[in-house]
Amino acid sequence: MEDNSPNIHTYGALPFYQIHFVVKGNGKMFEELLLARTRKRVKGVIKKSVEDVWWEGGKIAERLNSDSRLKHLLISILKDDDDIFIDPVENAVRIYTRFKIESDLTRHLSKEAIEAYNIIAGHVKSIMKEFE
């Protein structure tokens, strides 16, 4: 007996990924301080270039905005990326981007991108230690 249902869905691995960096700690305790995301000003329609990058959110946004090395890295890595988010959860703080196509993995995990995520994680850790 054949199943000719129009509602058949295929499941399985999809060719998308999401980059997550995790800082362990009581993230919920610092929710107001650590919730943040990047914003950017882009120039051009077809050949886009990032002119400026800044952070919006809690106390951490002030620190991240004052880090000139991080800003330089973000301008170069966010030209192809969406925003970066900092999200405190129950027992950690997640630093992540939106879902990406699997074929772009090496471009989104460049040396500069990993350095930027490490700088962000360092700022997260320092705020968590400061306000414990």
List where the protein language model places each region.
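Short N-terminal edge-element motif at the start of the domain
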Residues: 1-7
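Charged, low-complexity intrinsically disordered regions
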Residues: 10-16, 22-132
